[in-house]
């Protein structure tokens, strides 16, 4: 798991997300507390439960982006789900328990990758030996057995050197690789994914053990395939499973987006089964329960739950009281200003302007955004948000695409040309649309 300090986490988030300091600090502290808890004595560690977070803010201000970036920083099992995808137990649709099953699958895959990475050097050496055995078959005695000899002879060492330098990469050889198991693809109705997995596992077991298949491959491809095969042999599946379940129980993070969509609004008279029932099903997961997965039983007592919602049609108090109590940390994200839009266009790593400059540079078209041009784009997006529906920073994508449409279309024929995107250019391309509210409502 990540050992970054809260300050380092916030600094990393700052390079991708503009503003929202309170939300960044909250998730940074929550992530660091995961590490702090693991430093405690086992008796005290069992008593320390994570403080779950509820992020509240209008659409397009960075709630989902914080989750995306956090997933990369966490170095722990992480899953992001939409609350609207789930229905109450007993109705057709996905049950909330599938969140934990999917998170466990993520942990298994992650732990397997880490284990294979640790034995990567040994696996690559063994893969090299197998390829050298094909290129330089060992001498055999009259009985067909390999003769005892110096495997690291001068010729073998010479070939190993060439292999490592890539001089043999394009040579084709016949190599025995593990044949993929013949699986049975089963299309299951929603909510029956677990049963489908069990059936598929049963059919795979019936198909027998692992078989090999002779294939003609380039040496560089054979090295990769054989290294994966040897790496899989060097790891213990049972130990992996135990480690993955430990990781998911102690370091797992669940991000539930759009939680406001399963609130029953104060004025709502609907008895929608996918709302309050889903909240009640989420309760046991958030407060701690045991979920059955194909890898074993998984406890959710020490998982961190981060939830978010716009809460435009409902209020946080519309959540059922029990769930409100399980989300003690409330963070309100602020609506973005025109100045924030300006910073979003220039400051983050791989900002929108950088992306367009790089994309059109592939066609040998040089794009330059001036300070007044960027200010005008930001003001235009902010103005459209104010006069129509406020969709936050996502409006910048729409405005930029409209602005760059003509040059993107003609770029192939304009190799070597330059374009300066200044105030005048932005006004000529977007002026009429922004001034005319009816047009901007449908086009921007």
Curated annotation (Swiss-Prot):
Pfam families on file: AAA, AAA_2
Gene name as annotated: hslU
Assembly, per entry: A double ring-shaped homohexamer of HslV is capped on each side by a ring-shaped HslU homohexamer. The assembly of the HslU/HslV complex is dependent on binding of ATP.
UniProt subcellular location: Cytoplasm
Residues the entry annotates as binding ATP: 18, 60-65, 257, 322, 394
Main localization (coarse): cytoplasm
GO MF, one example: proteasome-activating activity
InterPro entries: AAA+_ATPase, ATP-dep_Clp_protease_ClpX, ATPase_AAA_core, Clp_ATPase_C, HslU, P-loop_NTPase
Stated role: ATPase subunit of a proteasome-like degradation complex; this subunit has chaperone activity. The binding of ATP and its subsequent hydrolysis by HslU are essential for unfolding of protein substrates subsequently hydrolyzed by HslV. HslU recognizes the N-terminal part of its protein substrates and unfolds these before they are guided to HslV for hydrolysis.
One Gene Ontology CC term in the entry: HslUV protease complex
GO biological process, one term: proteolysis involved in protein catabolic process
SUPFAM superfamilies recorded: P-loop containing nucleoside triphosphate hydrolases (SSF52540)
Name of the protein described by the UniProt record: ATP-dependent protease ATPase subunit HslU
NCBIfam families recorded: hslU, PRK05201.1
CDD domains hit by this protein: RecA-like_HslU
Keywords: ATP-binding, Chaperone, Cytoplasm, Nucleotide-binding, Stress response
Domain of life: Bacteria
Keyword Cytoplasm: yes
Family from the record: Belongs to the ClpX chaperone family. HslU subfamily.
